[in-house]
Amino acid sequence: MPAREVYLKRPATRRQLEGICTRYDGQQRITQLDCEEGCSKRTQPPQRLNPRYKSPDLIHISFIIVLLCILSMTSSVVAQTTTGSSSSKAAATPILPRQTLPTTISLPPLNISHPVLQLALPPTSSLYLTFSICSLTSNATILPTVLISTSSPASFNLGSKPIRDASTGGIPTSSGGKGYNYKSGRNGATWGLKWSSGFGNWTLNGTSETQVHLLLGLGLGNDGSTLNTTGVGNGNVVVQMGASTSGPLHALSAVYPLLGDTTSTSALIFSPLLYSSPQPEPSYPNYTLPGAQLAFPDFSYSEPLNSSLSSNLTLIVVPTNASPTSTDLGNSICAINAASANSSVSGANNTILKSFQPEWMTVGDEQGFRSYWVLGDLAEQGNYTAWVSDDKGVLSQPAWFATKPAGFPCQLVMPNDVCPNLGYSAPLDANSTAVTSPSGATISPTSPIQTLPDDLLELIVQNLEAFSTSLLSHACGRDLFSHVSSCLDCYSAYRDWLCRIVVPQCGAANSTSGATVIETATSTSTSSGTFPTPSTVLRTPSSPRNPSLPIPAYSYYELLPCMSTCNRADRSCPVSMGIRCPKRKVNAAKSYAFVGDDHSYGDGSAAQGVAAQDRWGNRWCNG
């Protein structure tokens, strides 16, 4: 079938919008879009035209309409000419007008009937392209090949020995990706896009204007001409492309949402650490420790963030069985948005509580600012996938969590000014304040506990004040105290230990069938496959953890504190403060969780090889 040429036609007047002129077998067909006058029917050679308008407000919308019309008309044409040379294909390639940049568009679908698409971008010295796979065919293993050329004429032959090219894009494995893009040799001008779970990117940073050509295909070989559509499957592959000359419109962050904890129908989720803000170290001679009730600093929007995410975040949560991660599209923002549109459990109808700006806390063993969300009306023992995205187009890595079984008795407790390390379920009386959605439906019959009960609060405050008074009698702020820690380190470690002992964390009933010691662990907690089994023990009103503390009115399984919480306080504080931790081979298993009998390994700290939580926030001990 002879190839068709598609190009933009220059208008006769500045007020006109260009027509799309198509020449096929020497006969020209003209499709007009809002032309004030008829388009000329003279045969015109293909050319790239810069549109002119009196009304700048219409430029962006008008050119997107033109581009989409061009692409929809040419996708089938290009697919039928894939056996031709690269140069001949480029001659009939539609050009994205410069005025549409920056823009995000969904390209015409690729399928068994139309497996190839080619287009060109306007000459530029700087270009940032991002790609997301919105959907796959019935054969989810077939990903579209994306070849990029800056040569003239375009050549899409990647060669038999392409090299990695980190300078143009791709996502390194250290950031949750699958590697960098490929390039056709050190001085080559052809690149192959490397997909990372449905996301890819490519960047041009040159010194002179260059025209960029793209060739996308299903079953397309790296030579840009071999096409094998066997096994492509039914349905469409849809790719969303973002193009800009000033910076990428979409990006991936290597960080994850952090799970606080779940109940049977609710979940507490924190953002990644946005801004690290350790407590300021006092100095001698005016060495003063923080009060029992901390004065939290305000979040400063002018401070540089520790995360590639901005502070304006949106939480996205969908059931895992409806998640694009099931087809390895967990980094595709358009696939995630489609799943969220159909199955979201993180919208207004599921939100019990959320922060309006980042707040200071010490969850995740890090001092600094995070945002949080509490979701309700979730399924019992449900599996969910979560992301956070920001207003700059940056997407986090996906995190997975599960809700507890029916009958789970404990309540979610939020970080507060006395115990900023909380953020989990605890055996406290329920806050019976019901939460309803904007439509009036009940999201949850209870609310998270934001202030501790008076008896627990008074107990913690009294202990902190007494400990502070005793600690300040030492040589705080002077070399005589310690070469490795300070009085503030000691006081902070004691606060962390005290809060976890007085406000224990609840665990699931089926964790270890009552066992309190984990015998083996072969890896750090960053590997979910070898993550230690949560260490829980049954607590009842008749056999509480500590009879001198307020006793819950119901039975629950306690997730034991990590041995590291006691060890940290022991190491940081003077011997005279009297902090002593139990021995592993003696009686430590009654009160603390650890791995093995070697005191130098597995206490729940990252320094000892098995951190308390994995990268998503799932814990095997409370620490």
Swiss-Prot record:
Please give a single GO biological process term from the UniProt record.
calcium ion import across plasma membrane
For region Disordered, the annotated ranges are 524-544
Q: In Gene Ontology terms, what is one molecular function of this protein?
A: calcium channel activity
Q: Quote the gene name from the UniProt entry.
A: MID1
Annotated membrane topology: Single-pass type I membrane protein
Per UniProt, subcellular location reads as: Cell membrane
Chain's role:
Calcium-permeable, cation-selective stretch-activated channel (SAC) that functions together with CCH1 to mediate calcium entry into cells. May additionally play a role in cellular detoxification of radicals.
Which protein, by its recorded name, is this? Stretch-activated cation channel MID1
Q: Could you tell me which species this protein originates from? A: Cryptococcus neoformans var. grubii serotype A (strain H99 / ATCC 208821 / CBS 10515 / FGSC 9487) (Filobasidiella neoformans var. grubii)
Q: Which PANTHER family match?
A: AEL197CP, MID1P
